[in-house]
Amino acid sequence: MKKIFLLVLLAVLTACGPKKTEQQVAKPESNEAIFFVGTYTKKEGHVDGQGEGVYVYSMNKKTGAISYKATSDAVISPSYLAVHPNGKNVYAVNEFDGGEDSFAAVTAFEYNPEDYSLAYLNEVSSVGQYPCYLSIDNSGKFVMAANYVGGSVVLLPIIEDGMLGNYSSYKKHEGGSSHPRQDAPHAHQIIQHPRNGLVAAVDLGADKIYAYELDTVGQTLNYLRDFINPPRMAGPRHIVFHPEKDIVYVLNELIGTIEVATFSDSLRLEQKVQMIALQENGDDREPSGAAIKIHPSGQFLYASNRGEINEILAFRIGDNGELIKIGAYPSQGKTPRDFEVDPSGRFMLVANQDTNTIVTYEINQETGELIDTGYIEEVPTPVCIKFLGQ
């Protein structure tokens, strides 16, 4: 009888004790990192698009091997992507020409981790043609997009359930330069500085990088000044801010260089520190810089060079932000349009747009060197890679 009483008492105490919530229950860490791949779905002058939408893949965190999971609802050429910090929404530019009476678009998706599906939510006008880049502001309330043709940038509010609202602010760039591809402005990137909140818009056609202020209350982009004026005919394509230092790295597509500069908190240029070439002296092949990224550690910088070269360049970042070349590595395909370092910093995935492959490299954490893993995955016309949670 005493034994029964003790068992009943134990059961009552257990039932009355604190219960672990779903958040408190320890879950084993997944061995897969989810990432999304933007593609071209139609033939354009510079590419034979063979994709069917945005692709969802997983990467093995231990080996770097990748495997297909799902394809999004069909949309036209979702070439460049942005993943919302909420881990739920993915946004894509629809890179096409809407015609004389219309514009291209930006699409919102919802990601379901249970079945890896990417469901279409809505799309809105990009207020331009051939949008080629987009990013999410620091507050998570806006998508910012760059229209290559027409040379404009646009601010799109994120509304209920992750859908996009119509544009709240539009800025058109002016001017051009001397290269045949610079007959007009061609906006190629728009990003917000992670600390001071100011916005930089890169224009390949105008040879300019503009500084804007984002007014989240008024929902507007307000021009402040020309931030950086690269050399004539440089064709600035993308920039990347150092995660800790007030240093910016400018990838000049047309002349194949990276320019290193320091700036103030108000995005005022202070000093141009270095100009380093993607190719060795005497290499007369035409350069075509594409993507530029900094390793999560802040110690290394990488850039891709397309055209005849098809390489990934690796650099060590010095104490003053200067770049010291580590080496050049074959992309193992044609046109490395983009690459991405996974959030852990251990692996790099390279998207070879014109040979339909994604290649996995391992990154030496001490030296920044790239190590071939042997993993190559066939993916139709990959243009952009974005990891979930990055």
Locations of regions flagged by a protein language model:
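C-terminal motif of bacterial Sec signal peptides marking the signal peptidase cleavage site
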Residues: T14-A15
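Beta-strand-rich domains and repeat architectures in extracellular enzymes and scaffolds
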Residues: A26-N60, A70-P85, Q189
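Short glycine/acidic-enriched loop and turn motifs that connect beta-strands
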Residues: T41-G45, E95-E100, V149-S152, A206-K208, ...
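Short loop/turn segments immediately following beta-strands, especially the blade-tip
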Residues: Y57-G64, A108-Y116, L155-N166, Y212-T220, ...
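A short beta-strand motif characteristic of beta-propeller blades
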Residues: S67-D73, A119-V124, G175-R181, Y223-N229, ...
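Beta-rich, blade/repeat-based domains predominating
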Residues: V75-P85, V127-N138, E174-N196, P230-I247, ...
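Asp-box/WD-like beta-propeller blade repeats and closely related beta-sheet repeat scaffolds
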Residues: Y116-Q189
